[in-house]
Amino acid sequence: MTQQSNLKTVTGWALIIVAVFSAYLIKFFDDFNLAFLLFLLFQLVLIFRYKNVFSPGMRTVSRLLLGAVFLYSGFVKGVDPMGTAYRIEDYFVAFGTDWLMFSALFFSFLLNAAELVLGGMLILHIKPKLTSLLVLLMMGVFTLVTLNDALNNPVPDCGCFGDALILTNWQTFYKNLLLNVLVLIVFLHRKSIRRLYPDKTELAIG
């Protein structure tokens, strides 16, 4: 390996390790902290700046970590769909859309199913280009919603991980910023992703 190749490898793994370590640091920042927020945003900038340093192995690790988080989130909420429905009702009240109350349980099942399906597709590497796009869109929505939660506090708890892991609104926003690090690593390399299974196999797995 050349010196430049070694530098790319070190840089890529360093960015991933820093992101994982930052997830641990979230426990110490339960409210707004400008320094920590800038630190997380800087990581996102670095992902764009050094997007070419991520090897296939690094992309795989990022994909598996992201898939595991989606599966965990979908599972812990899925075991208590009514609890998730109550959280959704809180949002309906906060945004003045009380007339949607009747659909809270439906959206609870839909959200949990979407996270479980996307998590499984990430782990199993099914339709990687489509999956990376859908995950990017979902995380974009989640990030905007949790930014509003952090700034305006319309609900006390988004219930992102059900009752298994209670986070403040700012911690939830920080968490989503870090997840976006993994999302970008996967999404920015979607054109170079090779499918592992033919269409019939993917359909059978699904």
Predicted regions and their residues:
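Internal/C-terminal transmembrane anchor helices
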Residues: Y197-G206
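Membrane-embedded alpha-helical segments of integral membrane proteins
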Residues: F21-F36, L137-P198
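Functionalized membrane-embedded alpha-helices
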Residues: M58-G78, A104-V145
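Membrane-embedded alpha-helical segments in integral membrane proteins
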Residues: I16-F28, L44, E89-V93
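N-terminal membrane topogenic signal
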Residues: T2-L15, V53-S62
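Structural signal for the C-terminal ends of transmembrane alpha-helices
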Residues: L44-V53, I123-K127, I185-R194
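Central hydrophobic cores of alpha-helical transmembrane segments in multi-pass inner-membrane proteins
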Residues: L37-R49, A114-M121
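Perimembrane loop-to-helix junctions flanking transmembrane segments
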Residues: A85-F102
